[in-house]
């Protein structure tokens, strides 16, 4: 044991430091992304949105954080207390764990593993367990029904996302996220990114990501008219905050995945000066914000789907379309001699 720490202590300290720094930056960015979500929703409805706490309401999210932390957590009398309190922690930790392999710039990644895409798909699939645990342990019919809805919804749309990812992997020949970004680097700039040749898959990914993260118009899990607040109806205080945090981290993760798969990651839209002078992490952040803007606009202007419409879209439209695109992309790459070696 002593020999292990003698040879691996500094690498371990560096990884822990990187993880803490990423966690802090991610949580701060989530605070302002949540504020932007509320501001966009307010602008569409011709309102001002949060504008009291701090200049232009910039400290509103931190005030909400303080409110949640100081409130007393309550556990229903018939609930399974251990599972009830563990569920939000599982959801939040799994959402944060995905960022261990996401590169925000060339070489700026905690773990540059060769199966990064597979890792993210696996972690995002596990997040449904936190929701199932919350629904079952609450000992209430509304959270349990919402948890069952969420499980069916997430499983349905993960299939489509998987086929979308396969289309990109066929073009790249690698599961490494850094390799996917570098494969889009060309003299054509943004016209060489995969959003253009794989545009149908970009649309499928965007809509499936909305459903995967339970965002409007697919927020059937939190349908206020039917299920009150969904699987979170019995939660308050810090456990509720962890659920909200996990939800928004998952949304930003999907935005980052869309950026890496289709929008060139940290690559500039025009591969010439002065665009190349801008740091890659700035381009990455701007593209993630663009993806989140699409998420926010869908929440603001699209009415909620019925549950049968949601399932029909996933199984009868997206699944055949994405499967057909996998076959078409593979055939085109093979016959055109463009398949990666």
Swiss-Prot record:
GO biological process: aerobic respiration
Pfam family, one: NADHdh
PROSITE patterns for the chain: COMPLEX1_ND1_2
Location of the protein in the cell: Cell inner membrane
Catalytically driven reaction(s): a quinone + NADH + 5 H(+)(in) = a quinol + NAD(+) + 4 H(+)(out)
Transmembrane region(s): 13-33, 82-102, 115-135, 161-181, 190-210, 248-268, 277-297, 317-337
Membrane topology: Multi-pass membrane protein
EC number assigned by the record: 7.1.1.-
Presence of the UniProt keyword Transmembrane in the record: yes
Main localization of the protein described in the UniProt heading: membrane
Record note on quaternary structure: NDH-1 is composed of 14 different subunits. Subunits NuoA, H, J, K, L, M, N constitute the membrane sector of the complex.
NCBIfam families in alphabetical order: PRK06076.1-2, PRK06076.1-6
Primary role: NDH-1 shuttles electrons from NADH, via FMN and iron-sulfur (Fe-S) centers, to quinones in the respiratory chain. The immediate electron acceptor for the enzyme in this species is believed to be ubiquinone. Couples the redox reaction to proton translocation (for every two electrons transferred, four hydrogen ions are translocated across the cytoplasmic membrane), and thus conserves the redox energy in a proton gradient. This subunit may bind ubiquinone.
Name by which UniProt lists this protein: NADH-quinone oxidoreductase subunit H 2
Organism lineage: Bacteria, Pseudomonadati, Pseudomonadota, Alphaproteobacteria, Hyphomicrobiales
């Amino acid at each position: 044991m002593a020999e292990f720490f003698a040879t691996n202590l500094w690498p371990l300290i560096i990884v822990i430091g990187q993880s803490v720094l990423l966690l802090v930056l991610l949580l701060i960015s989530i605070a302002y992304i949540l504020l932007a979500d509320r501001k966009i929703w307010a602008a569409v409805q011709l309102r001002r949105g949060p504008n009291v706490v701090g200049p232009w309401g910039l400290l509103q999210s931190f005030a909400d954080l303080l409110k949640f932390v100081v409130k007393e957590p309550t556990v229903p009398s018939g609930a399974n207390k251990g599972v009830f309190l563990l569920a939000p922690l599982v959801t939040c930790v799994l959402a944060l764990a995905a960022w261990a392999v996401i590169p925000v710039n060339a070489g700026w990644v905690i773990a540059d593993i060769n199966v990064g895409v597979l890792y993210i798909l696996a972690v995002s699939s596990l997040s449904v367990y936190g929701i199932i645990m919350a629904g079952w342990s609450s000992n209430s019919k509304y959270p349990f029904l919402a948890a069952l809805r969420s499980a069916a919804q997430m499983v349905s749309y993960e299939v489509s996302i998987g086929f979308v990812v396969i289309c990109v992997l066929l073009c790249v020949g690698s599961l490494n996220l850094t390799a996917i970004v570098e494969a889009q680097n060309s003299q054509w700039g943004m016209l060489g990114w995969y959003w253009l040749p794989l545009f149908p898959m970009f649309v499928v990914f965007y809509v499936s990501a909305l459903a995967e993260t339970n965002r409007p118009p697919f927020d059937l899990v939190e349908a206020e008219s039917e299920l009150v607040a969904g699987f979170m109806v019995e939660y308050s205080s810090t456990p509720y905050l962890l659920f909200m945090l996990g939800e928004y981290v998952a949304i930003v993760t999907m935005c980052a995945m869309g950026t890496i798969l289709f929008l060139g990651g940290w690559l500039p839209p025009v591969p010439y000066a002065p665009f190349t002078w801008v740091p890659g992490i700035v381009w990455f952040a701007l593209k993630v914000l663009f993806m989140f803007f699409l998420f926010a606009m869908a929440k603001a202007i699209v009415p909620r789907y019925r549950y049968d419409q949601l399932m029909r879209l996933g199984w009868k439209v997206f699944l055949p379309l994405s499967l057909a695109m996998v076959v078409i992309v593979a055939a085109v790459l093979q016959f055109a001699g463009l398949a990666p070696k």
